[in-house]
């Protein structure tokens, strides 16, 4: 068993100083004081004096098997490793495909999802890719959702020249199929929408919600934190109807000419409109960060997304923008847990919940200790558990 003592607990709501007892992968007790000497067997004590204890991050947008490829085979990014997640506080992750579903497959994504689960974190996946009809393991997106316990929904691209250029009837049909499969399998059945830069933006999603009475909460439009007032307006309209809006986290503050804004700034904009509870943060980790020439016709360089962007945006939101930590944690914990149907076991620090826990310095949001499924992954800033080939 493990006891985390003397930490200020944020569940994400502030609970004050508590001791947390962990065993069997779950939080067994949370009390003002727990004496390790009265417990049977070996008990490891983590002293969190001066630190905050929070739920582990839930990252709903990762390229487990790598991404990229738009600049030739040499620009395919490598697979993610376990420590890319654990060192950055991610204890639950959802993998998906991107542009390339030719050299990347949903079968390979499933294998990597299972590998992450075996290595110690919790991993799920979305079937499909940018394209429609959706590539699938069992022959269709709805069959994957029904029969594969690791599949929580579908990935799709809209308003992007690399996307399928589907019609509104096609989208309505996909929504109906996903909805039925979600009901049968008792899953959330979400559709994560990669939102491109074409002028239509999210118009097709709004139309299918209006014309076909599709539930707006099926949709998770992502990459919405752009300096595009019309895109933000459309996303807010969908959020008012129940959709969750995902911001892609950054690792720096963009300059004035950059078309992106920080996830923290998007969250503040939605908060002013009373829509903060509809916002999630994700990292796009493992995906490519292409650097284009001036004409946007050729890639001249490539970076790789990292999960450390989550911590950067949290620190920005709390320590520079002034939001209370209890509130700022929600897009990284409680809200994505709800989106992915995990809110009865993840996203909170509470008795019987999975022991996915972070010990952080509140002044910087630097992560000192990480527990995933009750196992210590990082202790005193040192990696304790690594992936199979790390």
Summary of predicted features, one role per range:
Residues 272-359:
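His/Asp/Glu-enriched, well-ordered alpha-helical/loop segment
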Residues 68, 72-74, 80-94, 144-159, ...:
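Active-site gating loops and adjacent loop-to-helix segments of metal-dependent hydrolytic enzymes
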Residues 179-290, 298-300:
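Active-site core of metal-dependent hydrolases
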